[in-house]
C-alpha cells in the first residue's frame, strides 16, 4: 500500500493548474448513459474514481476511451447490460448515479449498494424515493438496488426532504427522459449540479433553474451527443489556496473560477490572506504571515463547503487564536483531528463541533488518512511540520486529487510516494 513521505518546513509558493472537478465529472459520466450518440468530454481528471466509473460504464456496454489529448470519448448507443456490479461499485458511493439514467432510458437497472469514504451516513434513500415518485418500482435484494418501470418515467413535483447533491442529480438525470414536467423543490445548488445540467441541455434536455433550489425539467424523448468541458475543481483550488495560507506562501491557481468559492475566499481574507481574482485565476499571498483563526460552519452551497472543512481545521491548528468549527453536513468528519493532535495540534471535539487552539509549530510523525479531504490535510500538515511525516492509506487522495505530489513539488514541497514494503 502506497504512502507519502513528506519533509517539512516548506513555504509553498508558485503556480498550479487546477484540474477538472471530480464532483462534476462523475455525474456527467453517468449521465452519458442517457445519450444515443457519441459524447466527447474534456478537462476530465485522471483519478481512481474516474477510472472506476469508466469501468462501470464499460461493464454496461459503453465504449469509453481517452484519446491522445486526454479527452474522454464515450458511446452509449449499444448498452446491453443493466447491472453495476459489487466488485466495481464497492469502492465508490457515486456509483448509485448509474441507476437513474438506466431506468430513464432502458426502464430497468440495478446497482450494488455502494462504498466510498467512511464519513458517516450518506443514505441512498433520497435517490430511491425520488425515482419511486417518478414511477419506478424499486426493491432491495441481495445487496442490490433494483429498479424498473413498465414504460417511461412520469414527471411530477418532488420535494427533497434534506438538501442532497446526490439525490438532486439522480432525479434531474431521470427526469430528462420522463413524460411531462418534473419540478425539484429544495434542490441542492452546487456548481457541479449546474455543470451537469449544462451538459444534459447540450444533449437536448430541457432543464431550467439549476443553481437555485427550484429546478424544472421538461422531459424529452431522447438525448443526443455533444462535446463538453468539465468545470474546474473548486475544492482542489481551495486546497492549494490553503497550502499557501498555512505556509506563509504565495500561490496562483490557474484555470479556475472564483465565483464558485466565495465562502472560502471570504474566510481566507478573514484569516489575513491577500486574495486577488481574475476571470480564470485566483492568487493568494500570505506575505510570510501566520494566519488568524477563523470560525467555520459548513452548509450546503452557497455556504461553506464541507469538503474544505478538514483543510481549514489544519489552518486553525496553526493559526493565531482559538476557533470553533461546526460540521453540519456529514457525521464522523473530524477523523483527521486526532491525527493532527498527534502532530502537536490542540483541539477538543464535542459532537459536531471542534474547538481548535492554534500552535506555532506542528511536528512530523506517522499518520493515517481516513477519507479524501482528511488525507490532504495531513499531507499539507506534513509540508509545514518540523521533521518527517509519513502519511499512510493515501489511496484516499488518489480518488480525488490528480497528480497531487507533482503539483505540490511544483510549489516547493518535499514529498515522495513509496510502497509500504519499501520502508525497511
Swiss-Prot record:
Molecular function terms, GO-annotated: UDP-N-acetylglucosamine 1-carboxyvinyltransferase activity
GO biological process, any: peptidoglycan biosynthetic process
Enzyme Commission identifier(s): 2.5.1.7
Enzyme kind, highest EC tier: transferase
Residues annotated as binding UDP-N-acetyl-alpha-D-glucosamine: 93, 122-126, 162-165, 307, 329
Pathway connected to this protein: Cell wall biogenesis; peptidoglycan biosynthesis
Residues recorded with modification 2-(S-cysteinyl)pyruvic acid O-phosphothioketal: 117
Catalytic function, reaction form: phosphoenolpyruvate + UDP-N-acetyl-alpha-D-glucosamine = UDP-N-acetyl-3-O-(1-carboxyvinyl)-alpha-D-glucosamine + phosphate
Protein name: UDP-N-acetylglucosamine 1-carboxyvinyltransferase
Nucleus keyword on record: no
Domain of life, per lineage: Bacteria
Residues annotated for phosphoenolpyruvate binding in this entry: 22-23
InterPro entries (alphabetical): Enolpyruvate_Tfrase_dom, Enolpyruvate_Tfrase_sf, MurA_subfamily, RNA3'P_cycl/enolpyr_Trfase_a/b, UDP_GlcNAc_COvinyl_MurA
UniProt entry keywords in alphabetical sequence: Cell cycle, Cell division, Cell shape, Cell wall biogenesis/degradation, Cytoplasm, Peptidoglycan synthesis, Pyruvate, Transferase
GO cellular component: cytoplasm
Pfam families cross-referenced by the UniProt entry: EPSP_synthase
Organism name: Haemophilus influenzae (strain PittGG)
Amino acid at each position: 500500500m502506497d504512502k507519502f513521505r513528506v519533509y517539512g518546513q516548506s513555504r509553498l509558493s508558485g503556480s498550479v493548474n487546477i484540474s477538472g472537478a471530480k464532483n462534476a465529472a462523475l455525474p456527467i459520466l453517468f449521465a452519458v448513459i442517457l445519450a444515443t450518440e457519441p459524447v466527447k468530454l474534456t478537462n476530465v481528471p485522471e483519478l481512481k474514481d474516474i477510472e472506476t466509473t469508466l469501468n462501470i460504464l464499460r461493464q454496461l456496454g459503453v465504449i469509453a476511451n481517452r484519446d491522445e489529448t486526454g479527452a474522454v470519448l464515450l458511446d452509449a448507443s449499444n448498452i446491453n447490460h443493466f447491472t453495476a456490479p459489487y466488485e466495481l461499485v464497492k469502492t465508490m458511493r457515486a456509483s448509485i448515479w448509474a441507476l437513474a439514467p438506466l431506468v430513464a432510458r432502458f426502464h430497468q437497472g440495478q446497482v450494488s449498494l455502494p462504498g466510498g469514504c467512511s464519513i458517516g451516513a450518506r443514505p441512498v434513500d433520497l435517490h430511491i424515493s425520488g425515482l419511486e415518485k417518478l414511477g419506478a418500482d424499486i426493491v432491495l435484494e441481495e445487496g442490490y438496488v433494483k429498479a424498473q418501470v413498465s414504460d417511461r418515467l412520469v414527471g411530477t413535483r418532488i420535494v427533497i426532504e434534506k438538501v442532497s447533491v446526490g439525490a438532486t442529480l439522480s432525479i434531474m438525470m431521470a427526469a430528462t427522459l420522463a413524460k411531462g414536467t418534473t419540478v425539484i423543490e429544495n434542490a441542492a445548488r452546487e456548481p457541479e449540479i449546474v455543470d451537469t445540467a449544462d451538459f444534459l441541455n447540450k444533449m437536448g434536455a430541457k432543464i431550467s433553474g439549476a443553481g437555485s433550489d427550484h429546478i424544472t425539467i421538461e422531459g424529452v424523448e431522447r438525448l443526443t451527443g455533444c462535446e463538453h468541458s468539465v468545470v474546474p475543481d473548486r475544492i482542489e483550488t481551495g486546497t492549494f489556496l490553503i497550502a499557501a495560507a498555512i505556509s506563509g506562501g504565495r500561490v496562483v491557481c490557474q484555470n479556475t473560477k472564483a465565483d464558485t468559492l466565495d465562502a472560502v475566499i471570504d474566510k481566507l481574507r478573514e484569516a489575513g490572506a491577500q486574495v486577488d481574482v481574475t476571470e480564470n485565476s485566483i492568487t493568494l499571498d500570505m506575505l510570510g504571515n501566520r494566519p488568524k483563526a477563523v470560525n467555520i460552519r459548513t452548509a450546503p452551497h452557497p455556504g461553506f463547503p464541507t469538503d474544505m472543512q478538514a483543510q481549514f481545521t489544519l489552518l486553525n491548528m496553526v493559526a493565531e487564536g482559538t476557533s470553533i468549527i461546526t460540521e453540519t453536513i456529514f457525521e464522523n468528519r473530524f477523523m483527521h483531528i486526532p491525527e493532527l493532535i498527534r502532530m502537536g495540534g490542540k483541539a477538543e471535539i464535542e459532537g459536531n463541533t471542534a474547538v481548535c487552539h492554534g500552535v506555532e509549530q506542528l511536528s512530523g510523525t506517522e499518520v493515517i488518512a481516513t477519507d479524501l479531504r482528511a488525507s490532504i490535510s495531513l499531507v499539507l500538515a506534513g509540508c509545514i511540520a518540523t521533521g518527517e511525516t509519513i502519511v499512510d492509506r493515501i489511496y484516499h487522495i488518489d480518488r480525488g486529487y490528480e497528480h497531487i505530489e507533482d503539483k505540490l513539488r511544483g510549489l516547493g514541497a518535499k514529498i515522495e510516494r513509496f510502497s509500504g514494503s519499501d520502508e525497511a
